[in-house]
């Protein structure tokens, strides 16, 4: 593992790092203002994590890129992603909320079967969700409802009820991301125009004959976006997938000849 990255395998280990009680071995809702003050560090989690930050906390390092992490930002991470801030020796008090849950929690549930539909877990931090005040209140309400269930003694209903409430939170995130795609239409149109120019350049030579259609991953990389965010944005803006637009692009010169 790369030097300077701290791997946190499970929910108990994360709770221990923050100095909070573990109410359930597979899931935790944390009021970060009540966590221990801590130094900046880069992490890899062995579980899903959703962070709502309520203070501006400077440059956040995701992978090898720096992003300005603003107040009221929601970031969703899948297991295995690298995130954090490089240690500069400072100690800070985090503020906001965190929901962390292990894949084992949702295995065999509706959420476990549909978790791949929540493609924002693979978005990059610069593609994070920026919440309105009303949206923030709804997200915090979901956190509190999950925590309320965690404070109940674990019984045969616990897993299903917790998973249902997490699924509701993720469905709200889907709705809010769709709103964000709409309200950022000017930015999205610019990305779409850049994508069209990228296709023009790709098909202008013989690269398509040598390599076939450009992959979504390649196109996203050229546009400095994650594949999932790029694919979702193109679908929302055009009603078609990036691959479908590539196929249409192939036929256009033919129609013009």
Which positions does each model-derived feature cover?
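Generic protein-terminus/edge-of-domain signal
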Residues: 1-68
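Short beta-strand His + acidic residue motifs that chelate non-heme Fe in jelly-roll/DSBH
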Residues: 59-61, 83-90
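Conserved metal-binding segment of the jelly-roll/cupin
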Residues: 69-83, 100
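A hydrophobic/aromatic-rich effector-binding and dimerization subdomain
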Residues: 88-152
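An amphipathic alpha-helical interaction segment
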Residues: 137-200
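Short hydrophobic clusters on alpha-helical segments that form packing/core surfaces
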Residues: 195, 199-203, 234, 238, ...
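Basic/polar phosphate-binding segments, predominantly the helix-turn-helix DNA-binding elements
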Residues: 213-250
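Single conserved hydrophobic/aromatic residue that forms the stacking wall/gate
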Residues: 249-257
